[in-house]
Design a protein with these regions (language model features):
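N-terminal module-boundary/linker segments of secreted carbohydrate-active enzymes
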Residues: 1-69
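Domain-level detector of nuclease and nuclease-like folds
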Residues: 68-168
Length: 168
């Protein structure tokens, strides 16, 4: 065990739709889990959200969506807030302790995003409007959340109802 090539070998290439989602959820549930309280993100974000290119000063982080340089240590929302990539109002509170889902975001961008689904049409928020690569990063996080908690639903709705998130 432990070989990366074996990790997802139980997932058949022939699976799709709900069958694939259930198989991925089952595989995901076998991983070792460490639970965090939402408040813990104030402490841990500065250690996991580092600049991969090493271009920002020590003790700082890159804000999600716009790469704004924000304070590493929690500063009571002066420069950054905890962005719920899958908004709590859309069921994201079920995964809010997961370090994959909550990201440091500048206060301005966090407010601008609100709880909109992602997209490029009116009433949605484009995660790549400032830095294009965040479209893919946000989509991967959304897929991960739907696999981690099967009550979260990915679809193409742009309305603010239920546990829906889509228009990726």
């Amino acid at each position: 065990g432990g070989d990366i090539d074996e990790y997802d070998s139980s997932i058949s290439d022939s699976l799709s739709g709900n069958s694939l989602l259930k198989a991925l959820n089952s595989l995901n549930n076998t991983k070792k889990v460490r639970s965090f309280k939402y408040a813990d993100h104030k402490v841990y974000q500065q250690y996991i959200e580092i600049d991969p290119q090493g271009t920002i000063p020590n003790g700082k982080m890159l804000g999600f969506y716009d790469n704004a340089i924000v304070s590493g240590p929690w500063d009571n929302q002066e420069t950054w807030n905890r962005e719920h990539v899958w908004p709590n109002s859309r069921g994201g509170s079920s995964v809010e302790g997961d370090l994959h889902m909550v990201r440091p975001t500048s206060v301005k961008i966090n407010s601008e995003r609100g709880n909109d689904v992602y997209g490029k049409i009116s009433g949605t928020y484009d995660p790549g409007q400032y830095v294009a690569e965040y479209r893919g990063i946000a989509a991967r996080i959304i897929f991960y959340c739907a696999i981690a908690n099967t009550s979260l639903v990915i679809n193409e709705k742009t309305t603010n109802d239920g546990n829906n998130m889509g228009v990726l």
